[in-house]
Amino acid sequence: MSDSTHIPTHYHLVGDIGGTNARFAFVPPGAHRPTALAKYLVADFSCFDDVMARLLADWRELGLPEAGPDKTCLAVAAPPHLDTISFTNSPWRFDRALLERHLQRSSITIINDFAAVARALPALTDSDVEQIGAGTSSAGAPMVAIGPGTGTGVATVVYDSNENPLVIGGEGGHVDYAPISDMEFDVLKRLRARFGRVSIERLLCGAGIVNIYQALGDIRGLPAELISPEDIGTAAQHDNPLAAEAMAMFFAVLGSSAGNLALTTGAMGGVFIAGGIAPRYIDLLRRSDFRARFLAKGRFADYNTNIGTFVITHEDPGLLGAALHLGERL
């Protein structure tokens, strides 16, 4: 929690609500940078109503104005345009009536969580990212974010004729998965038997790491005893063969998918990897075929060679992007 002595009388609220964490911050009027208020684990709350009640209780404990925020922007891991927001990778759901009941007078905007990440990209500094491989980020060119975390998010930022950033959202994590190597084809066969249709999110998220690991165990005839992505990632860092192969495939598939996005969007401004997995296992990412697969685009390999790939290390680009989005509407 922030020190209540630094909280202004009038303020705006931003939230970044994913499948694992719900983060909230305040933004003083006229500012575009958020100041952290609270972070909650989604698993600790049975529904969104409960976390909002907890947030309001924490506000009161900090001496925040009872009237609530002037304006609110929530970035959610769900399609934001529906009347009822149902989170893709958690049981939470809510509608505007619930928000209005909790937030009272606040003007409320809801955006996709990865639209918020994309909006933050132009504001990131060199200290907010780590580059993987060569390539550059051309000013004023399209930038794309892909984020394996609890799920897989994708969004792009382009610029209008006045050089203002425009975010193009979507559900790019749910496009069809296309294997490259023979082993990836074998993994796909097992995932198809389990899920039917296989999107890239079936591989490029925390649960996807487990899916890959279990499929490889079945193919290799080895016991796949680890049950969490954290355990698999840690085991890979300690040279467990099956876990290491799973993480290597995870980052190779991420490289292929990121390269496809670069071709699709013309992302000469760079491709940015968000979410919690890449920063946590950046040592494995650097040793993997991520960049090689990003470049392996046949006749268009040279096109991708010039495009930089970056891991976002900023603590919460979603909150930053939500604050910037809100600032454009003040």
Q: Language-model segments: which ranges?
A:
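Short, acidic Gly/Pro/Ser/Thr-rich loop/turn segments
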Residues: 22, 79-81, 151-155, 211, ...
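Short glycine-aspartate micro-motif
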Residues: 12-16, 71-73, 109, 143-147, ...
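Short beta-strand-loop/turn "lid" adjacent to the catalytic site in phosphate-handling enzymes
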Residues: 60-110, 115-128, 145, 279-283
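Short, glycine/charged-enriched secondary-structure capping and boundary segments
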Residues: 28-29, 87-90, 124-126, 159-162, ...
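Glycine-rich phosphate-binding loop of actin/hexokinase-like ATP-binding domains
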Residues: 128-200, 282-285, 290-295, 301-304
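ATP-binding/phosphotransfer module of carbohydrate and carboxylate kinases, centering on a glycine-rich
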Residues: 2-57, 68, 185-330
